[in-house]
Amino acid sequence: MAHLTQSVEYASTACCWLAGGRHAAEQPGSGGIAGNLPAPSSPRSFRSWRRRGSSRPAKGSRVTACQGAGRPSASSSSSTPSRARSRCCECQEIRGRCAVFDDRPPDWATSASAPSTP
């Protein structure tokens, strides 16, 4: 995932976390889930995902305050954002601090190579 931008990576991490059974409206925002969410760029990511039907704002929330899955997890995959974005960035250090991994990131999260996509 080293080829994803930081904001897209945090957005996808947050959406995966929410898809794990947590209700979007219970969360203060995706930044609380993933740590230091880069606020200026995250609204663009979520708007782009909303247009594609990948996410939706939680009832009563602002543009990016709370997001939920826009479609069933069976029809989504974690490779969707990587197909949409191809810009390179160095974000292994950021992934190592991701709250989703509970301070134990898997090897693929901090390696320099991107996973292969089908």
From Swiss-Prot:
Regions of compositional bias (Low complexity) in chain numbering: 71-83
Region (Disordered): 25-85
Organism ancestry: Bacteria, Pseudomonadati, Pseudomonadota, Alphaproteobacteria, Rhodospirillales
Top-level taxon in the UniProt lineage: Bacteria
Name by which UniProt lists this protein: Uncharacterized 12.3 kDa protein in nifK-nifY intergenic region
Species whose genome carries this gene: Azospirillum brasilense
